[in-house]
């Protein structure tokens, strides 16, 4: 079944997929209705069940060969960017280059930052540095980093993402600082 939509528009669904069965059913429905993308959020500790976004989107990518998959948004400042860069590059491979990495600082639930041992007031600066670290790691070349929050010796992350330079990074947020960060560091 096809929904008659203006071909210049793209339609996606931001959803919470609490089970594997729901993920499959929603993915198949979006494919049938010719949606363009599916987006999931991220929280460490939340009031409702939220699965890990990388694992969910890998499942979506296995069920659909055409849907763009994206995070909206991944709370990157709560994590070290090196393993996250590997997860994102892997999802880019599993999706055939259909991954958009939406990131943001969150912060509405301070207990999440406390649970991760990350000072909430550092979240903006950590996000900015994390984006720089991931772009380096996605270059396909040996790189090192010596920054304010993260440092590591020369490493060569392989394989590089399917998308040259890595998945597109979109920054979400509501503050002036978030808008400036998006303009400086993001692809959207």
Regions found by a protein language model. Name each.
Residues 47, 71-79:
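Active-site nucleophile and cofactor-binding loops and adjacent substrate-binding regions
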